[in-house]
């Protein structure tokens, strides 16, 4: 499983953005990180803005 964080780009980032319901551009920038953190908080995960195995599973 791919770990994604700010600065990453590509199709996996697009998948995350689509799942979060935000604009899809394939760039994991500050906006994507913000929404990842919000998602993680809402799901009771550690809100670090990094999409690792636990966040992938929840998405």
Each PLM stretch: what is its role?
Residues 33-34, 56:
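Short, well-ordered surface patches within globular domains
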Residues 8, 12, 46-48, 56:
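Catalytic phosphate/metal-binding cores of nucleic-acid and nucleotide-processing enzymes, i.e., regions
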Residues 1, 58-59:
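Intrinsically disordered, low-complexity Ser/Thr-rich linker and spacer segments
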Residues 1-27:
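Acidic, Ser/Thr/Pro/Gly-enriched interdomain connector segments
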Residues 36-39:
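Conserved hydrophobic/aromatic packing and binding residues within compact polymer-binding modules
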């Amino acid at each position: 499983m791919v770990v994604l964080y700010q600065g990453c780009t590509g199709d996996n980032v697009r998948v995350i953005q689509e799942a979060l319901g935000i604009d899809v551009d394939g760039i994991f920038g500050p906006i994507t990180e913000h929404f990842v953190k919000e998602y993680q908080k809402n799901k009771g995960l550690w809100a670090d803005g990094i999409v690792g195995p636990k966040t992938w599973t929840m998405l």
